[in-house]
């Protein structure tokens, strides 16, 4: 498999990056979920090697399902649709195309020495309307 075409040079110390898996273990167009310091992250690899990391939590429902979302595009923008209610999100920015009420949290991701690394800075909030406590990651 080819080297990813997208990575982030995020601020922070090297300890801010968490190794998730070997890059070669990811399948293009098939989302994978990872738990990083209590935060569920969805990894999405495109056939051209572009790699994205977003919250695995559906902003509309609070369910942890985005790794099973539908990968697509809107013009030149790569998208991920919720498998539940089909809200469509920009994988780069997290913007929701179908409702301004929602946004999908995105994370810096890179591949270093063949290992996928994600930078998660946890921000939590209470979401009682979703039955979710402080483990909810704000978008």
Predicted regions and their residues:
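Axial heme c-ligation environment in periplasmic c-type cytochrome domains
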Residues: 97-100
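N-terminal pre-ligand scaffold of iron-sulfur
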Residues: 1-77, 90-91, 103-139
């Amino acid at each position: 498999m080819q080297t990813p075409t997208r990575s982030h040079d995020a601020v922070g110390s090297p300890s801010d990056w968490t190794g998730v898996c070997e890059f070669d273990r990811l399948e293009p167009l098939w989302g994978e979920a990872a738990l990083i310091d209590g935060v569920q992250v969805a990894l999405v690899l495109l056939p051209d090697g572009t790699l994205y990391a977003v919250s695995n939590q559906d902003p509309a429902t609070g369910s942890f399902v985005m790794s099973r979302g539908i990968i697509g595009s809107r013009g030149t923008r790569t998208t991920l649709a919720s498998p539940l209610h089909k809200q469509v999100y920009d994988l780069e920015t997290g913007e929701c195309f179908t409702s301004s009420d929602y946004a999908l949290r995105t994370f810096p991701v890179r591949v270093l020495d063949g290992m996928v690394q994600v930078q998660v800075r946890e921000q939590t909030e209470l979401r009682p309307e979703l039955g979710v406590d402080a483990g909810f990651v704000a978008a």
